[in-house]
Regions:
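Long, charged/polar, surface-exposed segments that mediate recognition or autoinhibition
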Residues: 58-139
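Sec-dependent signal peptide recognition
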Residues: 2-10
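Active-site-adjacent substructure of cysteine-protease-like catalytic cores
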Residues: 309-321, 326-407
């Protein structure tokens, strides 16, 4: 009896373990893996989530996911299946990225890259063609392209550093899509985009939509989910690039160029990186407005203005929060009375607020989103947010002049594509606005 019970326990345990693992290759085996249907796949595989309500893609994230996804036996951190006309059009896998997995030894990274390429060669019967390109100083991107049975298999990996002992692995990613001989990546630059593919002004303006209630917004901006890491800046930039027709650059490459850590990066660092390398991506960035606190002097000025207003309103003054040599901006601002800070922003900067309103309307009418850097926690947001306080970056994609509101979107996946708030609330939390414009071929 005890033996039977033990056997049953082992069977149940084996079943449980198997149920918690999924080998993606098995799903894609067959004569035509791109016959996979979106309406059948996601309902059967609940560990994937739609990227957006448009269902242009389904995403798997390993973080806090009970199902462990593998491909050719290698653990997958993130998987995205892209669909067109309800059929699979592209598969993307992140096998390593430092934002999700943290830092690993460079020797281990080299071994991982070699083992994965060997496994893919066995699977496809092709060794592939390897390329390399310079992203920025001490940043080299490598790629291996394999073509087998009219399918393009792309492996990309990169590390940053000058000497081998200093090298920091950045990412290892894989893509699979139908091969198009007229768009062969083996004959193109690995790090510089083809500007003939960038959308024209006329194309972008065609994405503008209008509702009967006066809402004007930009449609067709692809969703990117930053995941649990602080990659909002990189994810916002990836969305803009994809919207402009630039599809070969993702948030991990952008995070590498901006020297981003899992906790994030400042918008100033993004502007600096794009000033140096934006031409490679076919874009140009411009700082339009800034109230961002970047120096001790900036914070001191804000405290002084707030305290002057607090004195007149007979409210409690605030002081800079400092522990040792570290100044805590968030904790300092958390002391402010929300109503008083709103008055400071709206009355003290009314001309800038009016310019903010005009800029949004002008850019949205042209089909151009606004990069929007905010400080969360200053306004009680009515719609779902996954971050309660602190610096964050979003996109403003619309407005309604009738009720003086804006339309915005977050890089948190489905449910965050289309949100609204009053322009006054938006202005209160605004720290910076950035214009990122396309540079199509002439």
């Amino acid at each position: 009896m005890n033996r039977i019970v033990s056997l049953l326990i082992l069977v149940l345990l084996a079943f449980t373990l198997n149920a918690q693992q999924f080998e993606l290759r098995e799903l894609l085996d067959g004569n035509n893996p791109f016959a996979l249907r979106a309406d059948e796949f996601v309902p059967k595989h609940k560990f994937f989530r739609w990227l957006s309500a448009d269902r242009e893609g389904a995403r798997y994230a390993a973080f806090k996911n009970p199902v462990k996804l593998t491909f050719l036996g290698f653990p997958v951190l993130e998987a995205i299946l892209y669909f067109e006309n309800n059929q699979l059009s592209k598969l993307y896998l992140s096998l390593y990225n430092r934002g999700d997995a943290g830092e690993i030894d460079y020797g281990k990274f080299e071994t991982l890259v070699a083992r994965f390429n060997e496994a893919l060669s066995r699977q496809t019967g092709e060794k592939g063609t390897e390329q390399r390109g310079r992203l920025a100083n001490n940043m080299v991107l490598y790629a291996n392209f394999r073509v087998s049975d009219d399918i393009l298999y792309t492996v990309k990996w990169s590390a940053s550093g000058h000497l081998k002992r200093d090298m920091k692995p950045q990412y290892l990613q894989f893509e699979m899509e139908p091969f198009n001989p007229k768009d062969d990546p083996r004959k193109q630059s690995l790090v510089r985009v083809d500007r003939t593919k960038i959308e024209t002004s006329k194309d972008l303006a065609a994405n503008v939509r209008r509702k009967a209630d006066g809402t004007v917004w930009i449609d067709n901006i692809p969703m990117v989910d930053q995941g649990a890491k602080g990659y909002c800046v990189a994810a916002v930039l990836e969305r803009i690039l994809k919207y402009y027709g630039i599809d070969g650059v993702n948030q991990h490459t952008l995070a590498q160029i901006m020297k981003m850590r899992s906790g994030g990066v400042t918008s100033e660092m993004m502007l600096d990186a794009l000033d140096k390398g934006g031409s490679k991506f076919g874009i140009k960035a411009k700082n339009r407005y800034s109230a961002e606190i970047e120096t001790v002097e900036d914070l001191s000025k804000l405290i002084s203005k707030y305290n002057n207003l607090a004195r007149r309103a007979k409210k409690k003054k605030i002081a800079q929060v400092q522990k040792g040599n570290i100044i805590f901006v968030g904790q300092t601002m958390a002391q402010m009375d929300p109503k008083l800070f709103r008055k400071l922003r709206c009355d003290g900067y009314s001309r800038a607020m009016n310019s903010f309103r005009r800029d949004i309307q002008s850019r949205v009418n042209a089909g151009l989103p606004v990069g929007w850097c905010v400080f969360l926690g200053l306004v009680n947001e009515k719609q779902k947010t996954l971050q309660l306080a602190g610096a964050h970056m979003r996109l403003i994609i619309g407005y309604n002049a009738a009720d003086d509101s804006i339309v915005y979107t977050d890089t948190w996946g489905s449910g965050h594509e289309f949100k609204t708030m009053s322009l006054e609330d938006a202005w209160v939390m605004t720290m910076r606005t950035i214009y990122i414009n396309p540079r199509p071929a002439r």
